[in-house]
Structures are given as C-alpha cells and as structure tokens.
A protein has these predicted regions:
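N-terminal Rossmann-like or analogous alpha/beta NTP/dinucleotide-binding catalytic cores
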Residues: 1-73, 168-169
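Alpha-helical recognition segments enriched in aromatics with Gly/Pro capping
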Residues: 68-71, 78-212
C-alpha cells in the first residue's frame, strides 16, 4: 500500500502492519509462522532477531565480526560485483536520526571502542556502537553470526544457496565458531518451471501450501 512507502528501509519490526492486527509487519509474519508451528504441535523455542540484537544476545558475535573485519571482507568481496564492492560492509548502520537501515560505506572502524563511523545523507559523521541493536549485519555474515551466537548444529537450505552457505561457514570459522552440519535440497518450481522465490513474489502462502 502507498501508505507504507514512508516505511521503506525500516526494519520489518518497525514497518506498520498493513493488516492492522499487530504492532509491526515483522510481528505479523512471526505470528503466522508460530500459528503454523502450533497447529502441528512442533516443540520449538522462538528466537526474535530484533530482540536478540537489542538485548545484546548477539553482542559478543558482533564484536568478533568487527575484530576480524578485514579478514571477513577478504572472504566476501570476491563474491560481489565491482559496483557493490565500493560501498560494501558487513555492518548496516541503523540511523539514529531516521531509524532506517542504511546501505552506506563505512568510513572508519574502531575495534577498541567497538564502533563504526558512517556519513548520513546530510554529510554528518555518526559513530555507532555495533552492540545493542544499533546495527544489523548483511545477510551472509548475519547467517554466520547466528550460527556462532546461537550454537546452531544443523542448517538446511536450497541448492541455490550453496555458495552463500560455504561463505558463511568460512566467516563462522574466522570468528572462532564451528559451522553447523549443512544440508541442501532441490529447488521448488512454480507452474511455469520457474524457481519459487520470495524476492520475486511467486511463492506460496502457508495457507496455500497446506491446501496443496
């Protein structure tokens, strides 16, 4: 909806729920997942990434990412296109001014203070601690960080993510962790033989999936 355009680039747990039932779109999505799990009597512990970032559960792992910043960049950069390499950083600052997740170049890292420095659109330099929900990670280092912080033993993923999982495993080792056992599966295709992809919007809802 057009009314959500101003929420672009906010964390999903800050985006308004378009259905008006929950505090955020993230809470809406989490509720749908938990409803599915509960209907089938799954025994699970629900982990909120937003809560773990804000409550400091990920802090030690984030500091390790910062301490090994250069080595991690050496692993990630060869997998990126030239244009992307120019501004890439594992850390995405969350602007204290707008609350938006920023994909900007990092001007400076301070391993002693545990901070990163970036420029706002106004040109103002902002120094942020990487702790307590001030930043989030790009998805590949985030994957590795969660394995480390949550002591994940086993991870499944589609075969299109094999290179990303292998890269995340390298990052996990760099920060002192042991990657989980990895298992990849074949891709699910739609009626046109195209890969089902949430980024393309041709996926199935949980309701449709259960119906089939």
């Amino acid at each position: 909806p057009e009314k959500l355009e101003e929420d672009l680039d906010l964390p999903l747990t800050k985006v308004r729920d378009p259905f008006g039932k929950f505090n955020s779109f993230g809470d809406h999505n989490n509720a749908k997942l938990k409803e599915f799990l509960d209907n089938y009597n799954f025994n699970y512990n629900f982990e909120s990434a937003t809560k773990n970032y804000k409550d400091g559960i990920f802090d030690d792992a984030l500091i390790k990412i910062l301490e090994n910043y250069d080595e991690i960049m050496e692993v990630i950069l060869p997998s990126l296109r030239e244009e992307r390499k120019k501004t890439y950083s594992p850390f995405l600052p969350i602007s204290p001014i707008t609350g938006k997740v920023l994909q900007v170049a990092i001007e400076e890292i301070n391993k002693t203070k545990g901070t990163i420095t970036y420029k706002e659109q106004s040109g103002e330099k902002i120094e942020l601690s990487v702790k307590s929900g001030n930043v989030k990670l790009q998805w590949k280092p985030d994957w590795a960080m969660r394995w480390f912080a949550l002591d994940v033993d086993y991870e499944m993923f589609g075969k299109d993510l094999i290179p990303s999982a292998e890269l995340a495993a390298k990052i996990c080792r760099i920060i002192g962790g042991n990657p989980p056992e990895l298992l990849n599966y074949e891709l699910f295709l739609d009626e046109n033989g195209q890969k089902i992809s949430k980024s393309k919007g041709n996926g199935l809802s949980i309701e449709d999936w259960l119906r089939y």
